[in-house]
From Swiss-Prot:
L-citrulline binds at residues 88, 93, 124, 128, 179, 188, 264, 276. The gene is argG. PANTHER family: ARGININOSUCCINATE SYNTHASE. The keyword Ribosomal protein does not apply. GO terms for biological process: argininosuccinate metabolic process; L-arginine biosynthetic process; urea cycle. This is Argininosuccinate synthase. Its EC number is 6.3.4.5. Keywords: Amino-acid biosynthesis, Arginine biosynthesis, ATP-binding, Cytoplasm, Ligase, Nucleotide-binding.
Length: 407
């Protein structure tokens, strides 16, 4: 394959992608167009633009994608109550499809030969970026420098940056920072002492969540209103998707909610450890589960729960644009037609707890479930036949076992 003449680079302005920008220019002698997505990572993006200009980028795209990110990616995922391996809210995974989508679109708009990313050859992101890109354009070339160059460690990367006078960010203690990924849904931290799972993560790693021990001593109540499975208002005030998640991040972070220390199984086969901060997402998940409790019938809810692990795994592994994810999404979205109503939660020292929920679409019938007189709403004698029919199989099995086992 001939060397590319123009490459669109997913560019954060950080150490890795700044080195990649320089490397692409020198390795291929090509033009590099940078694309920086504002997904709510909380950073000022103008420095990334200026850095790209300083390093000779042929074109620079900086786009605010926060609303699209939450509306078209985060919210559909939360309709499923998706958790990878029962714990991880998929904050990094769900951002990759949107970034890949815009990379491919910009490549097509600018006539670029290839796209490039800063994911390492050991991680999941390389798979996610590339599977998404190929799903959208089967002819696109993807350049993954970490799988090509000799800079095989963060130490060598820093040495390269110093040699080429590329600025290196430092943390508040004057050290190179953890490997961090951030967006409106979460912040993840990896590397350094976190690579030893037997060592407790230091408190200074937290960037958006107060330590639960330092959170307010007074609980705070918050009400979240849903329409067809998506949050639409907080405390009665309608808000856009990104605004809702921003406000829930503020509330959850204030009360120490959403810290996860996780050792997970990467798609590429190894285990890795990360510290995940997902304040708003943790609150939103508890609220969504709360409204489903009264609006979703039992069989539908159990079916939905049974497919959730597979759905979460597809997102984690980079198959957002696959037909199987879309088929599962159609089932999930169908289940949300009546998931409309309001949930009240109590936020307190690391926990978000649903304490009340109500809806015009509720299936909860106090007349049927009451311990008091139900005025004929439920005939308890109906349970006799129900039990006998369900017991028939068990009785037949038991009779056979007694016949052949003598007991």
């Amino acid at each position: 394959m001939s060397a590319p003449k123009k490459v669109v680079l997913a560019y954060s302005g950080g150490l890795d992608t700044s080195i990649i920008l320089k490397w692409l220019q020198t390795e291929y002698g090509c033009e590099v167009v940078t694309f920086t997505a504002d997904l709510g990572q909380g950073e000022e993006l103008e420095p990334a633009r200026k850095k790209a200009e300083m390093m000779g980028a042929a074109g620079i795209y900086v786009e605010d994608l926060r609303e699209e990110f939450v509306r078209d990616f985060v919210f559909p995922m939360f309709r499923a109550n998706a958790l990878y391996e029962g714990l991880y809210l998929l904050g990094t995974s769900i951002a990759r499809p949107l970034i890949s989508k815009r990379l491919v679109e910009i490549a097509e708009e600018t006539g670029a030969d290839a796209v490039s990313h800063g994911a390492t050859g050991k991680g999941n992101d390389q798979v996610r970026f590339e599977l998404c890109a190929y799903s959208l354009n089967p002819e696109i070339e993807v350049i993954a420098p970490w799988r090509k160059w000799e800079l095989g460690s963060r130490t060598k990367l820093i040495e390269f940056a110093e040699k080429h006078q590329i600025p290196i960010a430092k943390d508040k203690r004057g050290e190179a920072p953890f490997s961090v990924d951030a967006n409106l849904l979460h912040t993840s931290s990896e590397g350094k002492m976190l690579e030893d799972p037997a060592e407790e993560a230091p408190d200074h790693i937290l960037q958006r969540i107060t330590r639960p021990e330092d959170a307010p001593d007074t609980p705070e109540m918050v009400e979240i209103t849903f329409e067809k499975g998506d949050a639409v208002a907080i405390n009665g005030e309608p808000m856009s998707p990104a605004t809702i998640l921003t406000e829930l991040n503020r509330l959850g972070g204030k009360h120490g909610i959403g810290i996860l220390d996780l050792v997970e199984n990467r798609f590429v086969g190894m285990k890795s450890r990360g510290i995940y901060e997902t304040p708003g997402g943790t609150v939103l998940l508890e609220a969504h589960r709360g409204i489903e409790q009264i609006t979703l019938d039992g069989a539908s809810g159990h079916l939905k729960d049974s497919i959730m692990p597979r759905y979460a795994e597809l997102i984690y592994n980079g198959f957002w644009f696959s037909p199987e994810r879309e088929m599962l999404q159609a089932l999930i979205d169908k289940s949300q037609e009546h998931v409309t109503g309001t949930v009240r939660l109590k936020l307190y020292k690391g926990a978000a707890r649903c304490v009340a929920r109500w809806s015009d679409h509720s299936l909860y019938s106090e007349a049927h479930v009451t311990f008091e007189e139900d005025m004929g709403a439920y005939d308890q004698s109906d349970a006799q036949g129900f039990i006998q029919l369900n017991a028939l199989r068990l009785k037949l099995l038991s009779a056979r076992n007694r016949k052949f086992n003598g007991s």
